[in-house]
Amino acid sequence: MVQLAKVPILGNDIIHVGYNIHDHLVETIIKHCPSSTYVICNDTNLSKVPYYQQLVLEFKASLPEGSRLLTYVVKPGETSKSRETKAQLEDYLLVEGCTRDTVMIAIGGGVIGDMIGFVASTFMRGVRVVQVPTSLLAMVDSSIGGKTAIDTPLGKNFIGAFWQPKFVLVDIKWLETLAKREFINGMAEVIKTACIWNADEFTRLESNASLFLNVVNGAKNVKVTNQLTNEIDEISNTDIEAMLDHTYKLVLESIKVKAEVVSSDERESSLRNLLNFGHSIGHAYEAILTPQALHGECVSIGMVKEAELSRYFGILSPTQVARLSKILVAYGLPVSPDEKWFKELTLHKKTPLDILLKKMSIDKKNEGSKKKVVILESIGKCYGDSAQFVSDEDLRFILTDETLVYPFKDIPADQQKVVIPPGSKSISNRALIIAALGEGQCKIKNLLHSDDTKHMLTAVHELKGATISWEDNGETVVVEGHGGSTLSACADPLYLGNAGTASRFLTSLAALVNSTPSQKYIVLTGNARMQQRPIAPLVDSLRANGTKIEYLNNEGSLPIKVYTDSVFKGGRIELAATVSSQYVSSILMCAPYAEEPVTLALVGGKPISKLYVDMTIKMMEKFGINVETSTTEPYTYYIPKGHYINPSEYVIESDASSATYPLAFAAMTGTTVTVPNIGFESLQGDARFARDVLKPMGCKITQTATSTTVSGPPVGTLKPLKHVDMEPMTDAFLTACVVAAISHDSDPNSANTTTIEGIANQRVKECNRILAMATELAKFGVKTTELPDGIQVHGLNSIKDLKVPSDSSGPVGVCTYDDHRVAMSFSLLAGMVNSQNERDEVANPVRILERHCTGKTWPGWWDVLHSELGAKLDGAEPLECTSKKNSKKSVVIIGMRAAGKTTISKWCASALGYKLVDLDELFEQQHNNQSVKQFVVENGWEKFREEETRIFKEVIQNYGDDGYVFSTGGGIVESAESRKALKDFASSGGYVLHLHRDIEETIVFLQSDPSRPAYVEEIREVWNRREEWYKECSNFSFFAPHCSAEAEFQALRRSFSKYIATITGVREIEIPSGRSAFVCLTFDDLTEQTENLTPICYGCEAVEVRVDHLANYSADFVSKQLSILRKATDSIPIIFTVRTKKQGGNFPDEEFKTLRELYDIALKNGVEFLDLELTLPTDIQYEVINKRGNTKIIGSHHDFQGLYSWDDAEWENRFNQALTLDVDVVKFVGTAVNFEDNLRLEHFRDTHKNKPLIAVNMTSKGSISRVLNNVLTPVTSDLLPNSAAPGQLTVAQINKMYTSMGGIEPKELFVVGKPIGHSRSPILHNTGYEILGLPHKFDKFETESAQLVKEKLLDGNKNFGGAAVTIPLKLDIMQYMDELTDAAKVIGAVNTVIPLGNKKFKGDNTDWLGIRNALINNGVPEYVGHTAGLVIGAGGTSRAALYALHSLGCKKIFIINRTTSKLKPLIESLPSEFNIIGIESTKSIEEIKEHVGVAVSCVPADKPLDDELLSKLERFLVKGAHAAFAPTLLEAAYKPSVTPVMTISQDKYQWHVVPGSQMLVHQGVAQFEKWTGFKAPFKAIFDAVTKE
């Protein structure tokens, strides 16, 4: 056990730290703070902790006579830290008669400590307070120093006071019940205090990180009996005693630092703001990412950013930054907002640069507008005694991954700099492998601290190859080698990022690893690019030598599985080394540990980069193994058996490849740079770059055995290099390229060409570097020629010819391809652009993307370029990549034959305005029109699959972002390579849509189709095999049932068009803002309910599918139910709900696997809303939230048992949880035990308005809550077998009750005009009012006078609710409108008057909506961009028709009329973007190339067509044959029901015709919805209007 420690602060030993010190806590408070009243304050979460209960009971038992103990419990969470809670507590204290001798005892985390401390500072002008912190963060930070505060709506901690506690009693035992994430969160402050003040403690923290994380990750939830209430509570439990010493020390040491700083600067005038290290930037991130991200997580990111800022200023060494980053990761904290797990946790929120800087401007350390940041000098020490001023320019650079490089204008020609690059990556990685295999201790100095070596160190540690520690404040790594004897297989895959060197070296090392009882193999893996880079030659050699290795994905690349029960035999090993010398070095280094001496023969041609092989051999010699080169056989080496003996110290030479950048800077800017630790004796081939490349180009070179100095010629006088073989220094070719770009001859006939060869291996590095250089140099205006093993760079005649990379839309970035060498090379060329312009001339900077990729070999490169070499840099908000700016992600449709892919692909292309490509047809085009069937007969299925995969990968690469629909063959998923390509496309944001239907229907169809190649097996077997593949490859799914009638076919098309528009974001899912409802279905199968589904949904904005009520949960069954519902209800938005038993439903509580599958079905089916229970496991919740796409999430919580009143903390906690999850809608359902529960609910509703909230009470006593709920009220229907919850009402019942309460005012509405005796408007609207229970009345007001309408209705009827305007008043009424909609203005007529209140009216026109919606309802897509439109007639209705066709996306609209002279004035009166073409002659129609697929007839219907007009019409009707959908004509007249135009269109030209009655009803329904705000019961209205 640990000892009780007392830490002084402000001269008093008031901070007590120990473990299990409840006795001491009670005794200290009662003895040293005598009082008549003690008040323990905590939140409801702490009340569940047994240790708290024990403490309260003990405190009560120990009270002296005359004293009392009060307890006050608040709701948990930051929302309790408010003025309201403070006032409630103060009122409680007053009511209880508390006086000035009261002692407040704050037991809890930071929220409790801050708020109770503030109450104590103001109550009775100040009473005593004792802090008992229970979270790690509170123990080491908020409880110490006397800062107290509450939050306001405008910001956190804005109102508070300094009020020092009488005691801070820190009991480590509280941490046993701290949640894992909160525990890790607190470590950020612990690491921070060590970082700024205590280097020894920082080192101790480093060495105990794995212990900490193992214990914290082992926390379990346990059920406990509450000693105060006897209820069963569930709490987290961590085995603190397993790391008690470490935890005690980390808490104590962190407290000591804060106490010392506070004692020196209580009121935070200078020194105390050092405690804000990481907070300036961290708080800015927290302001954006709250509540998803915790304080410590944001401070962790802030510390790394602020440390990088210090490194940027040249103050902090790169090693120290690497140490800080490493320890934060080791304790489970984020170091970047872009980490995958952290992005998922914060729900992919963006952190815009301007917002971060704005948030940073609100910081107490700032002075006015000047920002201040704490700068670190080294681990354990800050720079100066307080925060330092920092410019926005420097902050922008640090906060972004895109850097702006300004012209190198202000760099003096006589500048001389000394630059020491980081240690060589090549030597660092070799040294770590050899020292780990060696025996004894080796201190490695100048090790490169980069991503590559970090992965290598991690791997050596995980494989137990050596014991690794650090000295010299982390600058020296100490490797205690075990001679290879302890190498053991690890269970987790070794992730190597994009570290090619590490991956190759570790592949051979893996052959030496021993199995453990539980682990017989290891897995090496990496990022996406690493999984493309070659490793096959090395694997082939090791396999041939007895090591069993499997590829887990792509043949020839990582990931690989190396079996550790096989052995590395030795003997003769043959290896192809023409691609990478690292294969050779990998085997060389491990060869001494083979069972036999090794003869390594390099075969297949001249090995690449032989100098690196020589480097390896020389290093092995330093560690005691001598490699002999064969004198009889070329490229062959003899390696004896043996063990490396580690030298006591090994100093790693600086990286010669990295050294080329500062040396090239000198060459290009005419300055001088010295690299003091690389000379001609270097082991590295790139050391000759200065001598062999820069010297012939005109530079002065001074090179000794250990140093290199380059002085560049005057700017602009570098000479091209006619030819250079860079095979000995291939990595340096990129640097040579950018130097060559500004090199030119004085000879006017010269092409200024520099030719570089010997670099073929650079095509398979981090990227294809040769292609990358050619592509990016072109952006600067520099031409190149790619060679088989090199590149030619055609230098510019003048540096002034260099261009800022840009395209037609403006500047673009230089892509770095996640390649450190590409980034560093172009950072030099970027600074030369405009560098020779006049000094006062404004010069645009060059943008470099992904600057952090330099972390692979030189994390501090940008710091050197800025601080040492004098470059001006800035940061910038990322541009939308040019490729993404206009990106229209393509759609790939997969599925079995006969699933409807061909038809639905056409619908998809039409709906989205995309181009359609059938891959089977493309296959035939590429194979001389040979059919798939013929090709399979001649070449077999395997060859066909290869070709199919090739074609698919090509089209995705070339057109994946360009708006295509690709219809694939049914068997595309048979190929593993195709499956990977499909999944990759889906993960990159593409749409892979699995189209499926009932397998029985598919079988029947396929057995009767002779045009397709025969299956070699039963269709059902094929489906059984492919079903899972289709699911895993697709990110969306659509069930397309067989259609037996045209009406079904049209309904399916509408359903699909809305579906594809929803999943692609073309159709936005809107959450209703006004009164709205959704109906809860309770059927177990919708198949037999299709007729009822439409009336069931009357008046509703959405329909809930209670999946837990369905007959079964199979994917096919559930998808079919969704399809039936969409077709039957014309795609009313679906709420997908799986209600668990404990939340009042039927779904088993613990069936999480099935639940996940159901949610996956929902999201793939693009449901508009998904109900997510807030009681589900967190991992399921985050999985759904991060995969939601365009689906809106309803976070729900139900209290069926009536356990919680609406003022209980449960609801507040759940609401905060919903905010943290960032759900779109919150749904809370309580149980009304009495009427007052409804009043409490309304108070809750009124105080929780920051998210749309559905809040209702169940039972008949809660009915009023359903009436008062505003958004998406759950309702039932008389047509349902039962309601989904007790007390549910129908829409009509709710409206009637709401009317009786004064919520809906009865309105009088009219149709106005003359004659209106036969008007169907009253029947239309009154039918809707009756069905929905609305109190309104619609009547006729017959008049020819607009003036009379104004006097009697607009001005004279106080209950006036709106008017439908017909002839002759559509123009006359406009003068009395205060506003006109765009439609009314353009159409030039008003058919709808909408009251705005205060005697103001808006004029609208819904005729165009009647036309548009009638067309869409009859199979016309919502977007018809590839089809022209036609309007027949030029009267008043034609204007609405033209407006409607334009809204559908018709790029061109033709218009014909009996009197052609009327066309021109009509066209001129409408917007030019309508692109209306008036047709004057029949002949001109023949020249029209467009397909015409949609038409509106606006001519009188009661007489025959004029012959000339009929002739024009018929010529247009012919053009409907090739439309992308069934050509459709709408008749605007509704009497007679069949007109001459309809007859000729349908009977002679097979156009689909829509009668005028549909337009009439659709325009009336649009009016209904505008006047009432309710969704109209369309079918019932249509039947009523048309029943005559």
From Swiss-Prot:
Key word Repeat present: no
A molecular function GO annotation: shikimate kinase activity
Catalytic activity, EC: 4.2.3.4, 2.5.1.19, 2.7.1.71, 4.2.1.10
InterPro entries registered for this protein in UniProt: 3-dehydroquinate_DH_AS, Aldolase_TIM, Aminoacid_DH-like_N_sf, DHQ_synth_AroB, DHQS/DOIS_N, DHQS_C, DHquinase_I, Enolpyruvate_Tfrase_dom
KW Lyase (keyword) present: yes
Record key words, sorted: Amino-acid biosynthesis, Aromatic amino acid biosynthesis, ATP-binding, Cytoplasm, Kinase, Lyase, Metal-binding, Multifunctional enzyme, NADP, Nucleotide-binding, Oxidoreductase, Transferase, Zinc
Binding site for Zn(2+): 189, 279, 295
Sequence segments annotated as region (Shikimate kinase): 890-1080
Pathway membership: Metabolic intermediate biosynthesis; chorismate biosynthesis; chorismate from D-erythrose 4-phosphate and phosphoenolpyruvate: step 2/7; Metabolic intermediate biosynthesis; chorismate biosynthesis; chorismate from D-erythrose 4-phosphate and phosphoenolpyruvate: step 3/7; Metabolic intermediate biosynthesis; chorismate biosynthesis; chorismate from D-erythrose 4-phosphate and phosphoenolpyruvate: step 4/7; Metabolic intermediate biosynthesis; chorismate biosynthesis; chorismate from D-erythrose 4-phosphate and phosphoenolpyruvate: step 5/7
Ranges where the record places region 3-dehydroquinase: 1081-1293
Name this protein carries in UniProt: Pentafunctional AROM polypeptide
Organism: Saccharomyces cerevisiae (strain JAY291)
